[in-house]
Amino acid sequence: VANSDDGFGTTVGLESTGIYTEQDARGFSPLKAGNLRVDGVYFDIIGTMPSRLKQSTGIRIGFAAESYPFQAPTGVVEQRLRPFPEKNGISLGANLVSYGGKIGEIDLRLRNEAGTLGLVAGFAYSDFRYGGGSRVSSYTMAARPIIRIGGIEIGPWAAKTIVSFQQPHVLTIVSGDTVPAVPEQRIYLGQDWTRTRLNNDNYGLTAKVPITARLLFRGGMNYSNGDRERYFSEFYILPPTGFVARHRVIADPPQQIDAVSGEAQLIYRFDSGKWVHRLIGGFRMRSRLTETGGSQAFDFGTVEYDKPDLEDKPTFQFGPVNSGRVRQSAFMLGYLGRLPGVGHINIGVQKARFRASNRNGTTGAVTTSRDDPWLYNATIGVNVTPAISLYFGTQRGLEDSGTAPDLATNRNEQLPPTRTTQYDGGIRWKFGGGQLVVNAFQITKPYFSYDTSNLFTRIGDVRHRGIEASLSGHFGKRLQIVAGALALQPRVSNVTPTAGQQGELPTGTPSKYVRIDSNYKTDIFGGLTLTAGLQYTGTRAVSAKPFDSLGGKQLMLPGVTTIDLGVRQQFTLGGVPMNLRAVLANVFDHTSWKVLAPNVLDIDERRRFSLTLVADL
């Protein structure tokens, strides 16, 4: 809460605030859309940047994106790397997390006396456990040396994550007009032999180089890979009526995903009177290889739903894998102007180039696609009074569409990027100690779902139209609040005949979402802080098709409200500053489902306790 500027999304370490995350902003995923920026530089990263390198993650939309060059329609995920150390030190962290999981962390900070050489590095072991009984264990190692000489800052990094033990979430597939009860907590319905093993490596560099007093170079490169040695999906398919489910497992052969990406910008700053101007010219690129296919499916027949069905490990006979290559680049030109006390302008144009090819591992046939669009962004902001500001903007981008779900015939295939358009505007009121923001937006893009042959492909268009609000600030000397709310109207249109019968609601997208986080500082123990959080997730569609038995409507999940309570205490032990944090999440143990894809359900998390102790040496 203390590190949040608004209620739209901030993550520091294991804690987050706001209604949006890198996986969900205005109903879409800005991370899957390819809108990650690391210290302001574009990267196409497999997975996510390890926490040992990250200082924070913020979702930049609306007013929070007003100074961002080349804004993106689905929003920008801004990740800040750990900065040059102010002093030498070591941080040790011990975390007890949900359902008995644990995390151990050590972070190192070193610098020389001259302030020209620094190092941030870390190691972590994590053992996460989930409400459905699955478990993930991993090791992460990361290091980032930093060189600062005469205003130049260059910071290479290397990070490696080894997932040594990962049980897949066992999914439930519904085909009728009812949703089953959530299975008993912490009963794993999967197999002992479906353990996934994978490696994730990230190597990169960022650089800021002042060329003259007005001209600055900013850029970076990154290599990222995800080496999947073993990968499984397990699910139970429920018939339209009854609770005798079909049990299936899909196994994948070893597959490789890797990406090289980067960006270079030249920024020229000059003034004219009170106006501050920035001209930006740049180039960004990526080249991504994705292997898919060769999978083997196992059908273990019908079993009683929500009871473990242990099967013997079968013999695997995988097929050849498919190989997909995406090459994308853009030349960019932008202008940012600001007149203090009056307003700002942010304009950008990009000439993008997209090329993709996919080689079928079985037939050897190669398919290709291409696009050469012009992209743009334009935002104008006006300071009506010193306390009240307005903004209006539009963006058109070429954004990624993610990958096909595990149950599709084109399982894990990289979906083609799509042209996305957004219009938005908002008002901000700054008051003593805080601010209130209200925005309205509309985003349109192609819609991907299953067709009648179970291929996950484009079947129409989707529009998200909504209003979002954020209230953040200090209310008195003790109370701090970060609150956000979203009212969304998602709609699917222009559905192709090959999609079969489709409803107007995209699956899994809630109509409303509210999150409130608060801190209240007391005088107990010299400053014990009480924390509380509330989350409300509105109704969302489970099925793509409507049912006559439901009055021609789609199968829906009801809204759910959860409450979190916690405490935070800072103290000194033996001269060592320490921070203790305890949280009881979902206090009243509400049960619910998550919708991952049409008719695909996963168990949402239930009541759980976490305890964190951090020492700064």
Feature roles, as predicted:
Residues 341-342, 440-444, 458-545, 591, ...:
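Gram-negative outer-membrane beta-barrel transporters
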Residues 89-91, 95-170, 193-216:
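Transmembrane beta-barrel wall of Gram-negative outer-membrane proteins
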Residues 279, 507-617:
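Conserved C-terminal beta-signal and adjacent last beta-strands/turns
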Residues 164-177, 287-296, 353-355, 381-424, ...:
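Surface-exposed extracellular loop regions of Gram-negative outer-membrane beta-barrel proteins
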Residues 199-227, 246-361, 383:
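Face-selective signature of the C-terminal outer-membrane beta-barrel domain
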Residues 5-6, 27, 33, 37-39, ...:
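A beta-strand signature from Gram-negative outer-membrane beta-barrel systems
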Residues 146-148, 153-208, 225-257, 301-316, ...:
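Acidic/polar loop-and-plug regions of large Gram-negative outer-membrane beta-barrel proteins
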Residues 208-210, 216-222, 226-234, 390-391, ...:
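Membrane-embedded beta-barrel scaffold of Gram-negative outer-membrane proteins
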